[in-house]
């Protein structure tokens, strides 16, 4: 029996270029390029050990200095890789910061990864699914990517649920970032 390939249809987020970056709009959210002025937003998220538990090698909260360095890397990466990098996500109506989502090459060059994280107060409101769906559509329909993966720590079940809601296929475990990760994937329709 032939396995069906999960696909991601174009949900129609509005994509536009902003001065110094890009932006994607969804029903509730504005995703735009990070700027150095976003340090406090990123610190509120990355400074929380609950958020960082499954992020990076150490899984620990970041200091203000580490966040300032991270913003520099995010901005630099976005300039070198148009259409990719972590995007700042906020509510369209209020401007409240609700997280970050973006596309990045996996370090071994084997795939493009969808990555996202949210401040703890924003968990459970559908923001992760909404922003990730828009970024997936951007990757497939604007950047022309054929395949995008989502990687999670094996014990990060909430993130795995988000990836499954997006229609990504669970491909089991593989080594990435020097550790065992759960791999999910989707292909362009």
Residues of each region from the PLM?
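GNAT-family acyltransferases
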Residues: 1-121, 134-138, 142, 151, ...
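Structured interaction and signal-relay segments at domain junctions
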Residues: 166
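Glycine-rich acyl-CoA binding loop
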Residues: 124-129
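Conserved beta-strand-loop-alpha-helix junction that forms the acyl-donor binding cleft
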Residues: 150-160
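Conserved active-site tyrosine of GNAT-family acetyltransferases
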Residues: 163
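Short alpha-helical segment within the catalytic ATP-binding CA
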Residues: 117, 130, 158
């Amino acid at each position: 029996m032939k396995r069906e390939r999960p696909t991601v249809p174009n949900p129609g987020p509005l994509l536009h270029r902003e001065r110094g970056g890009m932006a994607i709009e969804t029903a509730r959210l504005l995703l735009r390029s990070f700027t150095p002025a976003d340090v406090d937003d990123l610190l509120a998220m990355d400074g929380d050990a609950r958020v960082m538990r499954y992020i990076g090698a150490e899984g620990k909260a970041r200091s203000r200095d580490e966040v300032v360095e991270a913003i520099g890397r995010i901005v630099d990466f976005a300039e070198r890789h148009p259409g990719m990098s972590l995007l700042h996500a906020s509510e369209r109506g209020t401007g409240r910061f609700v997280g970050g989502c973006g596309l990045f090459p996996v370090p071994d060059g084997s795939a493009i990864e969808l990555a996202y994280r949210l401040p703890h107060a924003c968990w459970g409101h559908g923001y992760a699914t909404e922003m990730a769906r828009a970024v997936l559509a951007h990757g497939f329909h604007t950047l022309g990517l054929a395949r995008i993966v989502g990687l999670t720590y094996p014990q990060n079940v909430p993130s795995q649920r988000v990836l499954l809601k997006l229609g990504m296929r669970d491909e089991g475990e593989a080594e990435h970032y020097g550790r065992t990760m759960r791999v999910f994937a989707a292909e362009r329709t």
